From Swiss-Prot:
Database matches in SUPFAM superfamilies: Aminomethyltransferase beta-barrel domain (SSF101790), Folate-binding domain (SSF103025)
Enzyme class: transferase
GO cellular component, one term: glycine cleavage complex
This protein's name: Aminomethyltransferase, mitochondrial
InterPro entries, alphabetized: GCS_T (IPR006223), GCST_C (IPR013977), GCV_T_N (IPR006222), GcvT/YgfZ/DmdA (IPR028896), GcvT/YgfZ_C (IPR029043), TrmE/GcvT_dom1 (IPR027266)
PANTHER family assigned: AMINOMETHYLTRANSFERASE, AMINOMETHYLTRANSFERASE, MITOCHONDRIAL
Residues involved in substrate binding: E221, R250, Y388
Task performed by this protein: The glycine cleavage system catalyzes the degradation of glycine.
């Protein structure tokens, strides 16, 4: 039931309806050879799970280590002396304060204060910023960035964008450091959460290793030359600790960690304040109010939002979007945006938006599932402890 439920949820929420014209990652043949069940996702063909199933894959990642194909993510390099000014004209984060090799999660916003995408931006030790965007937002993000870059250049600014041909793999789980250190010339203990380095990985040069991920575990994402991606993946999967993992495990892992999925939990109808992502707003940026939608966002900070993103736990049938969340009087107070049975906890977890008056952890609400009402408890996120390798 768990595995079938997660597969069905992925199909409903993220997958396109037809396989024609799908892009393939360099690891496509490897996935198929290892029993990956391929599905369409954001215009790409990607594995949803492997023969061992979603439950085993999820738990293996929590206990050991898994390899995820994230080649569908858009990777962009931003060059030029005005690259920081360019990016800060689009996002809410303090890019200027990033040290060489340091990155941050930030939000691309519009003039209404809505979230256009969530990005990871790294100030590389080289001469550029490295930006990773969601695959489903790739065309939109490119148009926004290229449009703004053209405006800056027309005004005499120096900025240039280069879409990277590199692909990417995520290595996630408590065994990651042991596995990866064997193939790195660098001391991995010096690479803390949200820092990045250009290096060679298991003999493959031209890689970028960033200590981050989408599971709540210690992990890295490796940007690798497309022509060497299979070689690197095979080296990693040659380690007994490393299993291949698919979209189903990635989704349940990120939900347990309380991480947002763009298009479900955040989109162009939500603001950073409503989403509980106020921490992404740099202190200097709040004062300067020089990012898109700043007036609206800072007004919400002052007056408090009318709705908030919350976590929910329940027993019984899984809570799936767009299930209605009901208050004590049986009136609608919100909507579920993500949900699945938690392999780690053995109960249902979900996130959604509710009226602010009903957002306090410990509040009992009701969720309507197949025309029946089931109790759900507002629960603090993350649902399971995270294990990021933080700087001491």
């Amino acid at each position: 039931m768990l595995r079938a439920g997660c597969r069905a949820a992925l199909a409903r929420r993220h997958l396109s309806s037809a396989p024609e014209g799908l892009k393939q990652t360099p690891l496509d043949a490897l996935h198929r050879a290892r029993g990956g069940r391929m599905v369409p996702f954001a215009g790409w063909s990607l594995p949803v799970q492997y023969g061992r199933g979603h439950l085993e894959s999820h738990l293996h990642t929590r206990r050991h280590c898994s390899l995820f194909d994230v080649s569908h993510m858009l990777q962009t390099r931003v060059y030029g002396r005005d690259r920081v000014r360019f990016l800060e004209s689009l996002v809410v984060g303090d890019i200027a304060e990033l040290r060489p090799g340091q990155g941050t999660l930030t939000l691309l916003t519009n003039e209404r204060g809505d979230i256009v995408d969530d990005l990871i931006v790294t100030n590389t030790a080289e001469d550029h910023l490295y930006v990773v965007s969601n695959a489903g937002c790739a065309d939109k993000d490119r148009a926004v960035m290229e449009g703004r870059a053209a405006e800056l250049r027309a005004a005499g600014g120096d900025v240039h964008l280069e879409v990277s041909g590199q692909r990417a793999a995520g290595v996630q789980g408590p065994s990651m450091a042991q596995v990866l250190q064997a193939g790195l010339p660098d001391d991995l203990t010096k690479l803390t959460f949200m820092t990045s380095t250009a290096t060679t990985v298991f003999g493959v040069p031209g890689c970028r290793v960033t200590r981050c991920g989408y599971t709540g575990e210690d992990g890295v994402e490796i940007s690798v030359p497309a022509g060497r991606a299979v070689e690197l993946a095979e080296r990693l999967l040659g380690c007994p600790e490393v299993w291949p993992a698919g979209l189903a495990a990635r989704d349940s892992l990120r939900l347990e960690a309380g991480l947002c999925l763009y298009g479900n939990d955040i989109d162009e109808s939500t603001t950073p304040v409503e989403a509980g992502l106020l921490w992404t707003l740099g202190k200097r940026r709040r004062t300067a109010m020089d990012f898109p939608g700043a007036a609206i966002i800072m007004e919400q900070v002052k007056e408090k939002p009318k709705r908030k993103r919350v976590g929910l736990t329940s027993v019984g049938p899984p809570l799936r979007p767009p299930a209605a969340i009901l208050g004590p009087e049986g009136t609608p107070v919100g909507t579920v945006t993500s949900g699945c049975p938690s392999p780690s906890l053995g109960k249902n977890i979900a996130m959604g938006y509710v009226q602010a008056a009903h957002s306090r952890p410990g509040t009992t609400l009701t969720v309507e599932v197949r025309k029946k009402q089931h109790p759900a408890l507002v629960t603090k996120m993350p649902f399971v402890p995270t294990h990021y390798y933080m700087a001491k």
